[in-house]
Amino acid sequence: MTASAPEAPLLRIDAVNKNFGGFVALDNINVEIRKGERFGLIGPNGSGKTTLVNCISGALRPNKGAIVFAGVDITLLPANQRSHRGIARSFQIPRPFRSMTVLENLMVALDFAAHRHLLETEAHRRDSAMSILTRIGLASKAHTATGTLTQVELRKMELARAMATGPKLLISDEAMAGLSTSEVDEVLDLLLSLGSEDIAIIMIEHIMQAVMRFSERVMCLDAGKIIAIGAPGEVMANPRVQEAYLGT
């Protein structure tokens, strides 16, 4: 009996380099991420984390190497085309339309994604928006002005807008920064529930307890290079990680 071939990775980063003048921000990055994988990305400030996810999302283009998503080389594609193919990103500082309600904010994101999801009518998009808000625990805030939301509600709103595009890969950039312990748990539980839906998630986070609880694998960058990758416990026990990231 012939063994089945392993499933192709959802995302493949092949020998990616990114320079800013003479500064090497990323140095020969090679990594694969599976469909539905929960992947933690850590490292000290200036290690290359943001540059890497900017290259993945399309905000930057690498100087060398390739980025392959769902079997397609997207290295040269602009950010909007990557979004339509299934890459979404939430940011540390939410930037909603504060004069709009929570529901209206989500409708804007769904309008952008409409041609992918065949959400042909406003009623269909509204139903989809309410379904997302229910899933993330903001249904009761649907008609609330976004400018009145708390920090944790804004973070959930940011994740909801990312989810509205129907991503295969979600990049969560410091979604828990500045939150209380209980609020961190809320957002973490939400991300874990999204991961159970076969959405791959790259989490950039400085809260180590959250990274350990969330991630199936963790990668640590330092000075633009991968210094460790593997199970969370193994990475955190790595002396190079402790020296570079934890300062021990």
Labelled PLM ranges:
Residues T2-T248:
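Glycine-rich phosphate-binding loops of nucleotide-dependent enzymes
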